[in-house]
Curated annotation (Swiss-Prot):
Family membership: Belongs to the IF-3 family.
The gene coding this protein: infC
Function: IF-3 binds to the 30S ribosomal subunit and shifts the equilibrium between 70S ribosomes and their 50S and 30S subunits in favor of the free subunits, thus enhancing the availability of 30S subunits on which protein synthesis initiation begins.
Lineage: Bacteria, Pseudomonadati, Bacteroidota, Bacteroidia, Bacteroidales
Cited HAMAP family: IF_3 (MF_00080)
Subcellular location(s) of the protein: Cytoplasm
Protein name listed in UniProt: Translation initiation factor IF-3
Organism: Porphyromonas gingivalis (strain ATCC BAA-308 / W83)
Amino acid sequence: MAIDKTKNQHRINEAIRVKEVRLVGDNVEQGVYNIQEARRIAESQDLDLVEISPNADPPVCRVTDYQKFVYQLKKKAKEQKAKSVKIVIKEIRFGPQTDDHDYNFKLKHAKEFLQEGSKVKAYVFFRGRSILFKEQGEVLLLRFANDLEDFARVEQMPILEGKRMTIMLTPKSASKKGHTPPKTQVEASKQANESAETEEE
């Protein structure tokens, strides 16, 4: 059974055991009251006294309907969760001498990733003396970005970091309707790396 974290999160009415509180709410004169008077004001309106800021001095309490108060909290939490952006980054690796077959294979996967709403981090890995081909690697990544211009925009132009030259692409359109993106994480694309990679020294 799921636990309702919102329930019993706030002390209400008789459970509030302090000498005085700062009162807020609709149809009440805001200010500091002793706890008995604050409870009386809430009861006179057939509402609850809800402690919303226990660490304040004095604690802040709201005169409100507790059930509606909890409902609004849940609604707000649900809306915030729906608005949260979950970014998935797929990695695609090339060698400086990648052939057309391998290139097209990875291009196809990149299009699929972008259509799903994922970002694509493509990089050329230079092994040994293949670093001499860094200009060729840059040309390859720019060609990759150009071939994906209908699906993505360049977020980061090719940069060389150690033995890697990387470009970052972000999708132009939102995720496919009905697609539920996985949790935020950086995922290496195993499928895109299964093909043979030509990395000449």
